[in-house]
């Protein structure tokens, strides 16, 4: 068996990327065109697109109304909310 490349897509979700998201990563929106190109290339060439998604409920220990941003964070990527969805540009086939 030979090694094959994969596209490893980590948590490209609305709450981390889009303006107004609950825990936006600085500069993430500017990286979306590059993400789009990577996903399109992977789909076109048969590269496997592996994706993770952050997933929380309000009762998770990481979620806090008074976050320390080390061990706790404000509510984000709450299961079933628009912010938990992958952005369209990184949607899997």
List the predicted regions and their residue ranges:
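Active-site acidic carboxylates
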Residues: 1-93
């Amino acid at each position: 068996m030979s090694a094959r490349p994969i596209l490893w897509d980590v948590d490209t979700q609305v709450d981390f990327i889009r303006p107004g998201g609950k825990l936006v990563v600085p500069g993430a929106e500017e990286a979306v065109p590059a993400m789009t190109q990577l996903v399109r290339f992977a789909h076109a060439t048969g590269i496997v697109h592996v994706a993770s998604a952050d997933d929380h409920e309000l009762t998770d220990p990481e979620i806090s109304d008074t976050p320390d941003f080390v061990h706790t964070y404000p509510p984000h990527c709450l299961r079933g909310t628009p912010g938990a969805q992958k952005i369209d540009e990184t949607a899997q086939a």
